Each structure stands twice: as C-alpha cells, then as structure tokens.
C-alpha cells in the first residue's frame, strides 16, 4: 500500500500535487504504510488573517487538515477558530484543540506518540517486524518485544488505551 497521506501532530493531510508547495512539511519517519511528517509553522494572531489569506488556506478539525476548497470541509462542524498558523505562504486555521488523528476514515481515535508509549500496549500492529513488508497483529506482547520495538522506532500511533501501531524497522538480528 502506498501512502496517500501524511500524519502530522496537527492532523492528517491527503497528499496532493500542491501540498508540498503550500506547506513546509518535512518527512520524519515511516510506520509501515504511514508517512510521519512535521509542518513547520509559526503561530499568528487570528485577527491578522486577511481575506486574501482565506483564498488559499487549510483548516484543521478533528484530526484532519483540508484545503479551503475541499468537499470534506462541508462535513466539519466549525463553530470557532482556536488558533492560526503560517507555513510558507499559507495559513492553517485550527478549529478545535483535538489532537486525534483521522486515519483512513477509521472510526477510532488515534494519536501520534513517541515510541516509548509501546510499553502501554496490550495490542500491537507491527509493520516490518521480521522482514520488510510484513504485518503482524500481536495480542499481549512481551516486555522484551516492547523494549526492542521502542529502541527501533521513533514514533508510534496509539489509541491511548493500549492499541499501538508501530514499525519494527526490520533488521536480521531484531528478535535474536
């Protein structure tokens, strides 16, 4: 599966031709098919947003970031503007303080955490654990496995209640 979106701390972005032109995104890591990125932003005062900024801006709401001309924007229940950020020459308007990620329209909240959160796992979805491209669902993983996964990865995706998605960054000596 090729990644069709970038997971960032501000939300999930669908990859488009103009995405990298509009936003200052740096790729930090991969978790299986998921790209983990960061958007370089500077917070600005909401009162400084001009009408011309609104012609080419993005909205962040409930874990998803969409351009102002997206059909998805109609589904957002936006009642207020919580914060605004500038990235390159584009504005991102945050409409809530929710850090939940909307990943592939799954109806389960996920959050981006450092890999150390793997120690809270009772269920692990592990990509690239033994060989490149493999996938394993592990129930009640051992502490030894959690330790090795935390050393091999920088980030994990978690529901905050014990379900972790992580990349094993397979190498030949991983579980020996």
UniProtKB/Swiss-Prot annotation:
GO terms for cellular component: host cell endosome. It is found in: Host endosome. GO terms for biological process: symbiont-mediated suppression of host antigen processing and presentation of peptide antigen via MHC class II. Pfam families: Chordopox_A35R (PF05989). Induction: Expressed in the early phase of the viral replicative cycle. Keywords: Host endosome, Host-virus interaction, Inhibition of host adaptive immune response by virus, Inhibition of host MHC class II molecule presentation by virus, Signal, Viral immunoevasion. InterPro entries: Chordopox_A35R (IPR009247). It comes from the Viruses. Belongs to the orthopoxvirus OPG163 family. Mildly affects the expression of MHC class II molecules on the surface of host antigen presenting cells (APCs). This is Protein OPG163. It comes from Vaccinia virus (strain Copenhagen). The lineage of its organism: Viruses, Varidnaviria, Bamfordvirae, Nucleocytoviricota, Pokkesviricetes. The gene is OPG163.
């Amino acid at each position: 599966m090729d990644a069709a979106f970038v997971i960032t701390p501000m939300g999930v972005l669908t990859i488009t031709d103009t995405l990298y032109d509009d936003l200052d995104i740096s790729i930090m890591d991969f978790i299986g098919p998921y790209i983990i990125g960061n958007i370089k932003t500077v917070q600005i005062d909401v009162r400084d947003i001009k009408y011309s900024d609104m012609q080419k801006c993005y909205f962040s709401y409930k874990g998803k970031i969409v351009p102002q001309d997206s059909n998805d924007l109609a589904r957002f229940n936006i009642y207020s503007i919580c914060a605004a950020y500038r990235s390159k020459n584009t504005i991102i308007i945050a409409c809530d303080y929710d850090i939940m990620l909307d990943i592939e329209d799954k109806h389960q909240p996920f959050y981006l955490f450092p890999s150390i959160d793997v120690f809270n796992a009772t269920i692990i979805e592990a990509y690239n654990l033994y060989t490149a491209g493999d996938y394993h669902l592990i129930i009640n993983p051992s502490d030894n496995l959690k330790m090795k996964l935390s050393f091999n990865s920088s980030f994990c995706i978690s529901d905050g209640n014990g379900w972790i998605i992580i990349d094993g960054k397979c190498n030949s000596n991983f579980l020996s």
